[in-house]
Curated annotation (Swiss-Prot):
Principal localisation: plastid
GO molecular function: RNA binding
Family listed: Belongs to the intron maturase 2 family. MatK subfamily.
Localization per Swiss-Prot or TrEMBL: Plastid, Chloroplast
Superkingdom assignment: Eukaryota
Record GO cellular component, one term: chloroplast
Identification of the protein by name: Maturase K
Physiological role: Usually encoded in the trnK tRNA gene intron. Probably assists in splicing its own and other chloroplast group II introns.
Keywords: Chloroplast, mRNA processing, Plastid, RNA-binding, tRNA processing
Pfam families linked: Intron_maturas2 (PF01348), MatK_N (PF01824)
InterPro entries hit by this protein: Domain_X, Maturase_MatK, Maturase_MatK_N
Entry annotated with the keyword Nucleotide-binding: no
GO biological process: mRNA processing; RNA splicing; tRNA processing
Length: 509
């Protein structure tokens, strides 16, 4: 029991007191910190004009005004104005929230930079190349052919604003900062405007995205921290923490209720969840946990997570948000990829003296495929083709110049190839390339009031060479000195660190 309590004690060395005075007085230190992170644009250096809404000086003055005025004198005639602010509430709230998010990110950024400084002779890497989505690439690279079941988990919604505040209580030690955050949330927004749950993820309003993404990520740390704790306690080989890529915080003092319930049989409980073949990843509001265990073990995980989240976050969490699927019978739709395990038949001939036997072996193979139907649906929605995949012209682009039309089609094609470069089978991408290329030709022919064949004969086929840049040419520029033995690895699957999402097809930049 003493050993358990030692593990549950908060790790003081990993906690950073929240520098609350930065908001009011010592902004010079924040300026130095911001300069050290090599940010391209600093909210501290922007001029406090009307176009630069996130100036740190404006944030400081607004918060000071909030504390100098009477908070209870709130106008009821105009929902967008407050008497203690004397101006547009949404504008001021956006500026304050962005400034608060910047200050709150400092302890996490310091921890990130300290972990990165140990590499390459203390050289600081640019943190914009290390994001949460990059932790999904090793997950998709894992061999799932030996696994049996997958848990599809939708992280529960934070049904109360106080939950968002309490998620920071182990990191933010300044009580006045928490009071400011609590007052800010309850004053300006209600839950329906903070997080909308119409889709199986989370969507935030376009205003104050940085602030609420920070709160939601902190909430996500809390939800998934149970995996880190149980994994470290049940596994013989302790996993090495790499804070630059994994967006998790330590569990420790956050399962007191669990220890109270399982204090006597704690080791038995850990034995139930001991699984050296556990694979876990989270991106946005969805988590996936794959295991080699039986259906009974996965069902235990399911009910354990439901009970834990209900007790720890004081919310009603439905079991329907966690689905148990057999990996061999279901395809996984994750981050735009379609992953599945298929049986690859192979024939083996066995020779024994004068007799020979032919043995059929079915070997499991894990594939990451390009979802052709959703991609064609997206192209059809943007009027590049029909719902059956037949290319059509795009009349709204007919007024553009020929070079602009070709550049837009080529950019969309390159973005799709870039995003799905990690796919194990790329034949589907060439069908998408055919659709976009023919749609581009028909758009140009429509503009010049001719047929596609006539236009190509008059202009020449080199007009569409924007689409002819093959992956091999791109790889030769990316890996000019790659040896022949490594060329097959580069050619098969490549993950680019600048991938965040598929841009809107019509407005991709």
């Amino acid at each position: 029991m003493e050993e358990i309590q030692r593990y549950l004690q908060p790790d003081r060395s990993q906690q950073h007191n929240f520098l609350y005075p930065l908001i009011f007085q010592e902004y010079i230190y924040a300026l130095a910190h911001d300069h050290g992170l090599n940010r391209n644009r600093s909210i501290l250096l922007e001029n406090p004009g009307y176009d630069n809404k996130f100036s740190f000086l404006i944030v400081k003055r607004l918060i000071t005004r909030m504390y100098q005025q009477n908070h209870f004198l709130i106008s009821t005639n105009d929902s967008n104005k407050n008497s203690f602010l004397g101006c547009n509430k949404s504008l001021y709230s956006q500026m304050i929230s962005e400034g608060f998010a910047f200050i709150a990110e400092i302890p996490f950024s310091l921890r990130l930079m300290s972990s990165l400084s140990s590499f390459e002779g203390k050289n600081i890497f640019k943190s914009h190349n290390l994001r949460s989505i990059h932790s999904t690439f090793p997950f998709l690279e894992d061999n799932f052919s030996h696994l049996n079941y997958v848990l599809d988990i939708l992280i529960p919604y934070p049904v109360h604003l106080e939950i968002l505040v309490q998620t920071l209580r182990y990191w933010v030690k300044d009580a006045s900062s928490l009071h400011l955050l609590r007052f800010f949330l309850h004053e300006y927004w209600n839950l329906n405007s903070l997080i909308t749950s119409k889709k199986p993820g989370y969507s935030f309003s376009k205003k104050n995205q940085r602030f609420f993404f920070f709160l939601y990520n902190s909430y996500g740390y809390e939800c998934e921290s149970t995996f880190v704790f149980l994994r470290n306690q049940s596994s013989h080989l302790r996993s090495t923490s790499f804070g630059a890529l994994l967006e998790r915080i330590y569990f420790y003092g956050k399962i007191e209720r669990l220890v109270e319930v399982f204090a006597k049989d704690f080791q038995v409980t850990l034995w139930l969840f001991k699984d050296p073949f556990m694979h876990y990843v989270r991106y946005q509001g969805k988590s996936i946990m794959a295991s080699k265990g039986t259906f009974l073990l996965m069902n235990k995980w399911k009910f354990y997570l439901v009970n834990f989240w209900q007790c720890h976050f004081s919310l009603c969490f439905h079991t329907g948000r966690i689905h148990i699927n057999q990996l061999s019978n279901h395809s996984r739709d994750f981050m735009g990829y379609l992953s599945s395990v298929r049986l690859n038949p192979s024939m083996v001939r066995s020779q024994m003296l004068e007799n020979s036997f032919l043995i059929n072996n079915a070997i499991k193979k894990f594939d990451i495929l390009v979802p052709i139907i959703p991609l064609i649906g997206s192209l059809a929605k943007e009027n590049f083709c029909t719902v059956l995949g037949h290319p059509i012209s795009k009349p709204v682009w007919s007024d553009l110049s020929d070079s602009d039309i070709i550049d837009r089609f080529g950019r969309i094609c390159r973005n799709i190839f870039h995003y799905y470069s990690g796919s194990s089978k790329k034949k589907t991408l060439y069908r998408i390339k055919y659709i976009l290329r023919l749609s581009c030709a028909r758009t140009l022919a429509r503009k010049h009031k001719s047929t596609v064949r006539t236009f190509l004969k008059r202009s020449g086929s080199e007009l569409l060479e924007e689409f002819l840049t093959s992956e091999e040419q791109v790889l030769s520029l990316t890996f000019p000195r790659a040896s022949s033995s490594l060329w097959g690895v580069y050619r098969s699957r490549i993950w680019y660190l600048d991938i965040f999402c598929i841009n809107d097809l019509a407005n991709s930049q």
